[in-house]
């Protein structure tokens, strides 16, 4: 098992001077519901998962970081006062976290490190956030007397993406990786950044990701267009309701009133977002009553909205969603920005093997390749293991 301390430790010992350091881990995440709501000031509902990154870190008494990626069998060194980030993209994350921690007053010194992960790259489980959180947590512990609070650690990861990796992401992935809690999902208000834990211990159900292994190249331009649609709808609504800042402040009635000033396409996009923000709240209410049937129903509604109104699904994901429905799966939807990636499924224990078998078989028959299946369990956030 990759996430075992011994797995990383044996390679750390072999690669460096035979001594051992401290071991840290951080998880990837799922988002149960609340998709494309973050940039509309709404809610997201992530949870940390039992897959992630694990790293051994040991100060080396120099000003140089020596980093080894166990998975890629790649080695990089950089000085802590160098301005230029390393070329290897994985090393940029570590470099960026070092710079961001130094900016926040942590006296980071050189260290040796080796890391590995079992968050699959590209399946939308935020492997990069897991890597950032692992090192932010480690540097805070080893060099910062743990004086940087958890929220700031999440921001370190976000700033790393922005400043060193060219990704203009929100805070959700890093937040979930740092604040994750076993058996709980986190409702995060993307405007105020207030958060609340909700119990998620679905007895008799399993949470399964089915990865379509497709990535459609449209994604970034389409994503920007969706944002513009939302902004256009807000601008039209503001004429009558000047206090409105985001679609989060709107209901369907306000959108209907402004219909004449909104293009048909922008109207559909806004309708999806307004409904999706409400669905997050409905799912939280359902979880407080352990009503997983309602949770599942809302997941299907989200998929329908993402497919028909927001139009960010694709043939493969719609196929997997229909298949889940036909198998009697409790809930299923596309997870992440869309245009590929995976579906997240809430499956009754007794249906599990039938569903997985069918998903593999039918998908392969139609698309001539096999989907990947990942079972996930909601787990703890960034921590020191030993």
Regions found by a protein language model. Give the residues of each.
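C-terminal nucleotide
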Residues: 2-29, 54-87, 184-331, 346-386
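Short Gly/aromatic-enriched secondary-structure transition segments
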Residues: 41-48, 226-227
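Gly/Ser-rich oxyanion-binding loop with an adjacent helix/lid
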Residues: 2-24, 30, 34, 39, ...
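Short, charge-rich binding segments
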Residues: 46-48, 56-59, 105
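Short, amphipathic alpha-helical segments that act as regulatory/interfacial helices
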Residues: 49, 98, 136, 231-234
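FabD-like malonyl-/acyl-CoA
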Residues: 130, 342-346
């Amino acid at each position: 098992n990759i996430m075992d301390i011994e797995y990383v430790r044996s390679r750390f010992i072999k690669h460096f001077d035979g001594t051992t350091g401290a071991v840290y881990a951080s998880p990837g995440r799922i988002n149960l519901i609340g998709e494309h709501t973050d940039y509309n000031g709404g809610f997201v509902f992530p949870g940390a998962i039992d897959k992630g990154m694990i790293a051994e870190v040991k100060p080396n008494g120099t000003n140089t970081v020596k980093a080894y990626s166990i998975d890629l069998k790649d080695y990089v060194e950089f000085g802590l006062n160098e301005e230029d980030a390393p070329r290897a993209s994985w090393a940029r994350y570590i470099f960026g976290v070092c710079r961001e921690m130094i900016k926040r007053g942590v006296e980071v010194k050189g260290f040796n490190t080796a890391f590995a992960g079992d968050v699959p790259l590209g399946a939308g489980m935020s492997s990069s956030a897991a890597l950032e959180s692992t090192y932010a947590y480690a540097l805070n512990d080893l060099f910062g007397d743990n004086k940087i609070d958890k929220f700031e650690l999440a921001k370190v990861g976000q700033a790393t993406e922005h400043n060193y990796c060219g990704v203009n992401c929100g805070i959700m992935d890093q937040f979930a990786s740092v604040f994750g809690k076993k058996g709980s999902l986190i409702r995060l208000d993307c405007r105020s950044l207030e958060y609340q834990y909700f119990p998620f211990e679905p007895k008799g159900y399993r949470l399964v990701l089915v990865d379509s292994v497709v990535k459609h190249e449209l994604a970034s331009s389409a994503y920007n267009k969706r944002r513009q649609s939302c902004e256009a709808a807000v601008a039209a609504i503001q004429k009558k309701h000047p206090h409105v800042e985001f679609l989060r402040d709107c209901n369907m009635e306000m959108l209907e009133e402004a219909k004449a000033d909104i293009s048909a396409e922008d109207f559909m996009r806004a309708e999806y977002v307004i409904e999706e923000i409400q669905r997050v709240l409905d799912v939280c209410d359902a979880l407080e009553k352990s009503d997983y049937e309602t949770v599942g129903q809302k997941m299907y509604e989200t998929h329908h909205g993402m497919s028909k109104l927001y139009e960010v699904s694709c043939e493969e994901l719609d196929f997997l969603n229909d298949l889940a429905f036909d198998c009697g799966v409790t809930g299923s939807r596309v997870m992440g920005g869309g245009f590929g990636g995976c579906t997240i499924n809430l499956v009754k224990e007794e249906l599990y093997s039938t569903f997985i078998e069918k998903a593999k078989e039918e998908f392969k028959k139609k698309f001539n390749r096999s989907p990947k299946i990942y079972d996930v369990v909601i787990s703890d956030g960034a921590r020191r293991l030993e």
